[in-house]
Curated annotation (Swiss-Prot):
Gene name as annotated: gcvPA
NCBIfam families: PRK00451.1
Subunit structure: The glycine cleavage system is composed of four proteins: P, T, L and H. In this organism, the P 'protein' is a heterodimer of two subunits.
TM segment ranges: none
Function: The glycine cleavage system catalyzes the degradation of glycine. The P protein binds the alpha-amino group of glycine through its pyridoxal phosphate cofactor; CO(2) is released and the remaining methylamine moiety is then transferred to the lipoamide cofactor of the H protein.
Protein name in UniProt: Probable glycine dehydrogenase (decarboxylating) subunit 1
UniProt cross-references to HAMAP family, sorted A to Z: GcvPA
One function term, GO molecular function aspect: glycine dehydrogenase (decarboxylating) activity
Length: 464
C-alpha cells in the first residue's frame, strides 16, 4: 500500500517480535471462504497524477451549464476566502463540542453568527441553527403551538414551498396539529386571508413566496395578531439586506423568523449540507429549539461564552425537550458567518439588488417572446413564474421546453405544473447576481427559437 511509512525492514522486525512469518499470518484465523482475494473486475490502482487526469477528463464531460433554477437553492458567488477559512482545522467540525465551554473559539463564532442573524431579522434571539429551511419551518410550527397553548391550528399558505409544506405535514402528522391551507389570488400570486379564520396558533408568512412574489407582509402580520395568532416569517436571508426585517413587519413585528441559510455562502451540492436559521422574540426563547450560545464572565471577571438555557434541549430533559434536534450545522454556519462578515451590509445589499435587477431584465426579455407570459402581475425578488401555454403552443409542455433548453447547456428553470396544475404549463425561473447581460440574452434567444420550432411543428425536437 502506498503512503505507509514502514520500510520492509520495519515490517520484518515487527512480525518477528510477534512471531509471525508474514502479514497474511495475521489474518489466518479468517476462513478462506470469507476472504475476497484479488477482485478480477477491479482494475489495478493508478498513480496520483493519472487519477487526477482521469477525474479532470470525467469532469470536463459535464460541460458548462447556465443555471436559472432556484426554488430554495440559489447560485450565488462565494468568495474564495469563505471556505478557505471555514476548512481550517480550528473550525472544521459539524458540531457544537460536547465539552462546549472548552472550545471558546467555536462558541464565539456561533455567538457572532447569532448576533448577525438577529440584526438581519430584527428579532431578539437566534439559535445556533437547525438542519435546513424545511425542518426550521416545521420546528417553528411546533414552537407556535407550544407558545400559543389555546389552539393547535396553523395556517399555511399554498404559496409556501411544496417541499417545505410536505416536511411540515410529516413532522406534525401524529401530534394533533391541524394544518389549514390558504389559497392564493390567481391574478397576483399573493396569499388570500380568510374573512373568518377561527382560532389559530400561527400563520406562516413567506417572503418572498415560492412564486417569487412579494407578499403584503405588514397586512398579514397585523391580521395575524388581530386574530390572536403568532406570525411566523419564512424568509430568504438575501432579501433581508434590502427588504423590511421580519421584526419590523406590521405594528408589532413577526414573532418567529425561519428560513434556509444556503444563500449565505453554501454551495449548491446535491441538496446539502445546508442549514436552517431561526430567530424569535425574547418572549418565546424558552420554546425555541436548538442550541443557544450566550456571553458571560468567568470567576475572574473575564468574558467568555457558554451554552445557555440548556434545559430546553433533548440531552437535558428528553421528555420535555422543545425538539428532537439536539445539534446544529456548525460547519455551514461557520461559512455563513464568514460570508456575512466579509460582505457586510453593503455587500449583501449589492447581491440582493443585482439579483433583483437581473430577474426584472430577464422577465422583460422572456415576456416579449410570443407564447410566454408572466403568471402574476406582482413585484418579485429574484424568481418569477412564466406560463408557456397561450393557445399557440398546443402539445408543448414545460418539461419539453426545459429539456430542449438543457440540450443547449441552459438549465432554464423548474417545472411547477405538477405542484400547481391550475397554472398550466409553467416554469419557475431564478436569476442571481452571477448572471451577465450576455447570459440573459443567450437564454432569451434560445427560448424564442425553441418555441418558434414548437409552433411550426410541435412533435419535432429542437436540435440547434
Amino acid at each position: 500500500m502506498p503512503f505507509i511509512p514502514h520500510t520492509e525492514e520495519d515490517v520484518s522486525a515487527m512480525l518477528g517480535a510477534i512471531g509471525a512469518a508474514s502479514i497474511e499470518d495475521l489474518f489466518d484465523e479468517i476462513p478462506p471462504a470469507l476472504k475476497t482475494g484479488k477482485l478480477k473486475d477491479v482494475p489495478d490502482g493508478l498513480p496520483e497524477m493519472a487519477v487526477a487526469r482521469l477525474m479532470q477528463e470525467r469532469a470536463s464531460q459535464d460541460g458548462f451549464w447556465s443555471n436559472f433554477i432556484g426554488a430554495g437553492v440559489y447560485e450565488h458567488h462565494i468568495p474564495a476566502a469563505i471556505w478557505q477559512i471555514t476548512t481550517r482545522g480550528e473550525f472544521y467540525s459539524a458540531y457544537t463540542p460536547y465539552q462546549a465551554e472548552a472550545s471558546q473559539g467555536t462558541l464565539q463564532l456561533i455567538y457572532e453568527y447569532q448576533t448577525m442573524m438577529t440584526r438581519l431579522t430584527g428579532l431578539d434571539v437566534s439559535n445556533a441553527s437547525l438542519y435546513d429551511g424545511a425542518s426550521a419551518l416545521a420546528e417553528a410550527v411546533l414552537m407556535a403551538v407550544r407558545s400559543h397553548k389555546s389552539s393547535r391550528r396553523v395556517l399555511v399558505p399554498k404559496t409556501v414551498h411544496p417541499v417545505y409544506r410536505s416536511v411540515v405535514v410529516t413532522t406534525v402528522r401524529n401530534q394533533g396539529i391541524d394544518l389549514v391551507e390558504l389559497e392564493y389570488d390567481p391574478a397576483t400570486g399573493k396569499t388570500v386571508l380568510p374573512s373568518e379564520p377561527g382560532a389559530f396558533a400561527g400563520l406562516v408568512i413567506p417572503q418572498p413566496n415560492f412564486f417569487g412574489v412579494l407578499e403584503d407582509v405588514h397586512t398579514m402580520t397585523d391580521w395575524t395578531h388581530a386574530n390572536g395568532g403568532l406570525a411566523i416569517a419564512l424568509v430568504n436571508p438575501t432579501t433581508l439586506a434590502v427588504l423590511e426585517a421580519p421584526g419590523k413587519w406590521g405594528t408589532k413585528g413577526a414573532d418567529i423568523a425561519v428560513g434556509e441559510g444556503q444563500p449565505l455562502g453554501a454551495p449548491m451540492a446535491s441538496g446539502g449540507p445546508y442549514f436552517g436559521f431561526m430567530c424569535c422574540r425574547q418572549d418565546f426563547v424558552r420554546q425555541m429549539p436548538g442550541r443557544i450560545v450566550g456571553r458571560t464572565v468567568d470567576l475572574d471577571g473575564k468574558p467568555g461564552f457558554a451554552l445557555t438555557l440548556q434545559a430546553r434541549e433533548q440531552h437535558i430533559r428528553r421528555s420535555k425537550a422543545t425538539s428532537n434536534i439536539c445539534t446544529n450545522q456548525g460547519l455551514v454556519v461557520t461559512a455563513a458567518t464568514q460570508y456575512m462578515a466579509l460582505l457586510g451590509p453593503q455587500g449583501l445589499a449589492k447581491v440582493a439588488a443585482a439579483s433583483h435587477a437581473n430577474t426584472v431584465a430577464l422577465a422583460e426579455k422572456l415576456g416579449a417572446i410570443p407564447g410566454v407570459a408572466r403568471a402574476f402581475a406582482s413585484p418579485c425578488f429574484h424568481e418569477v413564474v412564466l406560463k408557456l401555454d397561450d393557445g399557440t403552443l398546443k402539445g408543448t409542455s414545460a418539461k419539453d421546453v426545459l429539456r430542449a433548453l438543457r440540450a443547449q447547456g441552459i438549465l432554464g428553470g423548474l417545472d411547477i405544473s405538477g405542484w400547481y396544475p391550475e397554472l398550466g404549463q409553467a416554469i419557475l425561473v431564478c436569476v442571481t447576481e452571477t448572471k451577465t447581460g450576455a447570459d440573459l440574452d443567450h437564454y432569451a434567444q434560445h427560448l424564442e427559437r425553441i418555441l418558434s420550432k414548437r409552433r411550426e411543428a410541435p412533435p419535432c425536437a429542437y436540435k440547434n
